Amino acid sequence: MTYSSQLLEMRKVEQILDWSQLIFRKEKTMTRVTSAANDEILVVSADSLLTNNITNNKTYKKKILHNKKIIIALLGQIELITSNGIIEFDKVIENIIKQEINPYLVENQIIQTVEKYFSKYYNKNFLQVCLFWRENQHFLLRAFQLNGDYKIMPFLNYAFGYDYKTKDNVIKVMNHYYFDTGEGAGNHLLGFLNTNPLDFSIQTVRNAINNTDFQTVGGDVFTVTLDKHGI
């Protein structure tokens, strides 16, 4: 099924169905982070399975981090194995958001810190970051990729909602939209949301976990919600 035909099928569905049947079929690269919002609440959900792409060993870890104002979902290479030990990017980023709540400063610190490790211990893999926050009654999303080749590679090149303080599709308004990753943030499904964000987000991830075709999705559903008061 092509990407355009997937989107066409999605538009035909008005209630929560088994969305995982419509989204990306390459089992070995599958991961799942789903976000959805209306005007009152933003919900981000993820599975908790991590699969080592060399040994195929499976471990479990939360892929969503947060402070009182920001939600961050991680995809791709969350851990970097080096001669000096294992660098856990989730712990690196968690330390950043413990000290900073401004999303723009958080983004800059993540880029500077993670790129420092990638440039020192170069490899071909990458870390993708989905950054969510609320500003002026808008729930906002910024998604980008970090690796040894690019300082920053923004995603969200398919227009949805409308741009926020930008002309180049790098920050998106999530109100009444969903954002669902298949093979990472750069290969995603998105569209208009006409149902409850909490139900949609949780059920989408749960369906992917229960789908035996998706061998790298598993564990429990982890969910974080953000409203006008924070998290």
List the model feature ranges, each with a label.
Residues C130-N136, V224-D227:
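Short hydrophobic alpha-helical segments used for membrane anchoring or interfacial signaling
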Residues L7, T29-N125, Y150-G230:
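Conserved short S/T/G-enriched processing/targeting/catalytic segments and their helical context
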Residues H138-L140:
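Structural motif
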Residues F144-Q145, F155:
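Acidic, low-complexity central loop/insert segments
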